[in-house]
Amino acid sequence: MLDPRAQTLLKTLIERYIAEGQPVGSRTLSRYSGLELSPATIRNVMSDLEDLGLVISPHTSAGRIPTPRGYRLFVDTMLTVESAADEEAVMRTVKTTLQAGEPQKIVAAAASVLSNLSQFAGVVLTPRRSHVFKQIEFMRLSDKRILLIIVTPEGDVQNRIMATQRDFSPSQLVEASNYINAHFAGLSFDDVRRRLREEIDELRGDMTTLMHAAVTASTDEADTGETVLISGERNLLEVADLSSDMARLRKLFDVFDQKTSLLQLLDVSSHAAGVQIFIGGESNLVPIEEMSVVTAPYEVNGKIVGTLGVIGPTRMAYNRVIPIVDITARLLSLTLSQQ
């Protein structure tokens, strides 16, 4: 446990390093900490913090910079988030961006607003598309071509174009959709397929043909996997900590290209409530030491369905980014639940 003097100096060092990006020396600490300490005393405290693994001294400078362990102590115990006025401004921007519409478009808008507000990369893990349907509708496009409209319980609307062996009249399409909605709504299409096998003798041939075509179109083309949406990757090219080294830059864009590590990290963070901070060099889930990820889960009707966050440098203004992530998650949950 650090004494108050050491806490103040560590907090000042990290705040100055985040603001300026340069190793912080004793003169800067004396100026900004508000403590009446001699340079020698400050150097002694810095030496103690270095022994504790909270700061390090780069070879090229007499100043010090925080370690991942130092950042962790800072965000867990010393961080002061932005003022209520700043949070109100964030809330207004997010509310304006997350307009009612199709869930997939709302989620994509969340990734965009995270990027725009943080000036880093915004990321959203979308919910798995439901195997279950709430309602379907058939619409005749032309001879032997029908548009199948599927509405999921989450409000997602999916369209499939079906090619059939014969033509169907509008009244036949309405009759078929009414029958399916009355008897099968709330089931997965695999369950519908099994039920059709059992009930095939009770249905007319044209009805059976149409239902089988709908089930086949839905299960063949359904995308049930989780998707990572990323917005603002290019913002990170402006961050020297991440882009100044070519090998590091290549690794960064491998993360965005492969997305495997991001999926794992976002999946882990979906199992805990509230904002979580993953710091590179400290968490094995963050593949680059100079990178941090701030995440929060979002919900639909009280059930966690995905995760969103901001990807940026370890040297980010956490006091600004944390409210952005928290507010966006809460407003995304509200918008999706009102659909």
UniProtKB/Swiss-Prot annotation:
InterPro entries: GAF-like_dom_sf, HrcA, HrcA_C, WH-like_DNA-bd_sf, WH_DNA-bd_sf, WHTH_HrcA_DNA-bd, WHTH_transcript_rep_HrcA_IDD. GO terms for molecular function: DNA binding. Disulfide bonds: none annotated. It comes from the Bacteria. Keywords: Repressor, Stress response, Transcription, Transcription regulation. Belongs to the HrcA family. PANTHER family: HEAT-INDUCIBLE TRANSCRIPTION REPRESSOR HRCA. NCBIfam families: hrcA. Negative regulator of class I heat shock genes (grpE-dnaK-dnaJ and groELS operons). Prevents heat-shock induction of these operons. This is Heat-inducible transcription repressor HrcA. It comes from Paraburkholderia xenovorans (strain LB400). The lineage of its organism: Bacteria, Pseudomonadati, Pseudomonadota, Betaproteobacteria, Burkholderiales.
